[in-house]
């Protein structure tokens, strides 16, 4: 970087920017669209987008707190941390990730410790949460390990457990690939060229 600064010129990268799923911006887009329909000014567009992001976060937090069998205080405590609140009332796509991870945690704990049986809609919900949050930040992938807390007996048959685990895993993997395939291909090609 010292060399670049000394030359005083800009350098362009051949690598594409890391992308994220457009779903992460839906709450903000709804707020902006609503403000535009009302004919409001630019500042109101900004605040409506942020407010809708906050409303989405609060709704998902409420759903998570209703679903989690224990630890409601801990979940709420994490949700009202200053940085979490700052993100919740911003345009950041981290709100979608946090909300999905809160709900994923709540659903996994509910299925592991409260519910007598795992239903198909529970697996679909876990797969959707994994697919939406997965491409945003790969660092949250270990959170899918919470699914392993759910006892096999609650699936009825071992075969159902394997199908469910495969469905959640493939939803996460396909979402990661579809959203980030261009970035992965570019970096893989660069690595091969460097070898």
What are these regions, as identified by a protein language model?
Residues 68, 104-122:
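Membrane-interface transmembrane helices that cradle and orient dolichyl/undecaprenyl
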Residues 57, 97-105, 147:
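Hydrophobic core segments of transmembrane alpha-helices in multi-pass, intramembrane catalytic enzymes
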Residues 86, 122-138, 143-149:
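Membrane-interface alpha helices of multi-pass inner-membrane proteins
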Residues 90-97:
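Short acidic/glycine- and proline-prone juxtamembrane loop motifs at membrane-interface regions
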Residues 145-195:
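Membrane-lumen/periplasm interface segments of specific transmembrane helices
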Residues 40-43, 62-82:
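Transmembrane-helix signature of polytopic, membrane-embedded enzymes
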Residues 1-48:
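Interfacial juxtamembrane loops and adjacent helix segments
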């Amino acid at each position: 970087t010292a060399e670049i600064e000394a030359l005083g010129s800009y350098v362009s990268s051949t690598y594409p920017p890391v992308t994220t799923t457009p779903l992460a911006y839906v709450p903000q887009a709804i707020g902006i669209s609503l403000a535009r329909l009302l004919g409001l000014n630019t500042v109101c567009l900004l605040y409506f987008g942020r407010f809708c992001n906050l409303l989405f976060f609060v709704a998902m937090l409420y759903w998570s707190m209703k679903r989690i069998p224990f630890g409601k205080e801990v979940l709420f405590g994490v949700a009202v941390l200053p940085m979490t609140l700052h993100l919740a009332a911003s345009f950041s796509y981290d709100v979608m990730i946090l909300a999905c991870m809160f709900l994923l945690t709540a659903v996994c704990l509910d299925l592991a410790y409260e519910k007598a049986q795992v239903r198909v809609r529970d697996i679909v919900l876990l797969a959707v949460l994994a697919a939406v949050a997965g491409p945003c930040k790969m660092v949250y992938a270990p959170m899918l390990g919470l699914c392993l807390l759910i006892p096999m007996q609650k699936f009825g048959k071992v075969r159902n457990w394997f199908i469910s685990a495969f469905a959640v895993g493939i939803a996460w993997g396909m979402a990661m690939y579809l959203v980030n395939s261009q970035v992965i291909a570019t970096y893989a090609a660069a690595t091969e060229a460097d070898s």
